[in-house]
């Protein structure tokens, strides 16, 4: 089964019906990301250990007859430009001097997690989010999966490339500053 061809809601339904486990979903997308990310550079940070741990907890919940949520087991990506997940590194778009560790979960992640989604990593963004292209000195450019000769534009380019290449179902996208949310 090509999981990337399902909708997020369809995948969540399959997980809740115990047709596929959340752990299997994470393993599937880990393999897919490992095969495809090097050509587009959508991700700056991946944490499949955390994702598998969350998937095992969700699987246990479902196996005990509890509902996992509409997005049960659905992999999501968080944007490196914004605060994301407690304990994960933050570079604010690849700015070495601003490297920190997030001290709280983002609003997007809390909402996605409440529906059963599982964060697998952080996506590339331009430094401070202030460029029409997704490129920075720390991680380099992100390409569109449709033509790797082109840059995935704007501050959410890593998120957009990850979703459009079927590496995750949902990804945190940006703030609208100077109109680049639509590049």
What are these regions (language model features)?
Residues 2-175:
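Gly/Ser-rich catalytic/binding loops embedded in alpha/beta enzyme cores
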Residues 181-183:
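Conserved small/polar residues in nucleotide/adenosyl-binding loops
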């Amino acid at each position: 089964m090509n999981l990337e061809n399902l909708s997020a809601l369809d995948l969540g339904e399959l997980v809740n019906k115990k047709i596929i486990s959340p752990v299997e979903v994470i393993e599937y997308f880990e393999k897919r990301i490992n095969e495809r990310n090097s050509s587009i550079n959508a991700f700056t940070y991946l944490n499949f250990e955390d994702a598998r741990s969350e998937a095992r907890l969700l699987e246990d919940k479902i196996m005990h007859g509890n509902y996992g949520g509409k997005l049960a087991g659905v992999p999501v990506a968080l944007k490196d430009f914004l605060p994301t997940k407690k304990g994960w590194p933050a570079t604010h778009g690849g700015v070495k001097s601003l490297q920190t560790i997030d001290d709280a979960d983002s609003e997007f992640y809390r909402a996605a997690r409440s529906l059963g989604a599982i964060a697998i990593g952080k996506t590339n963004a331009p430094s401070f989010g202030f460029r029409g292209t997704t490129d920075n000195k720390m991680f380099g450019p992100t390409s569109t999966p449709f033509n790797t000769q082109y840059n995935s534009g704007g501050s959410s380019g890593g998120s957009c490339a990850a979703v459009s290449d079927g590496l995750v179902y949902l990804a945190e996208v940006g703030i609208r500053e100077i109109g680049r949310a639509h590049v």
